[in-house]
């Protein structure tokens, strides 16, 4: 028996290639696919990868033109200081990953009470280069600057914090500052 998905839409879904290297950008260009650069994985050289993708793009039956999306890790809060505080749980999670510990994102209290060595503070600073954080206006300005620098056609954000409600608030504040929803 044949299996047929229902309902059938008028078009096929868009195909994206998510990557964080020049290889993935070149592959997306060669195959005529949309490309999402994973800034949240690697911020280094991504702007050049995006420019090369657009320059080398080969139209395909699926996509006539290049389309580039920038995926960014964001933590938005009412104040810059609060965003910095909320980032601490992710800082500790990334340190744990550096140590080979694959555990859930720690809660805020655990992150705030942890004593860090100088080397760990350096690792935190290294990882923070891939994060946009702050109050809504700060985050908006940084995201728009990144979009221009990377020549992105679209932005996509990912927010990870120590609890669901702060993630939800981050998205709500972003939606508000970008006027994507009606104020509550």
Language-model features, listed with the residues they occupy:
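Flexible loop/turn segments at secondary-structure boundaries
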Residues: 24-25, 44-45, 77-79, 163-166
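Residue-level signal for short, function-critical loop segments
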Residues: 21, 41, 74, 161
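Internal, glycine-rich beta/alpha segment that forms the wall or movable "lid"
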Residues: 1-31, 48
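Hydrophobic faces of well-ordered beta-strands that scaffold small-molecule active sites
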Residues: 14-18, 33-38, 66-73, 153-157
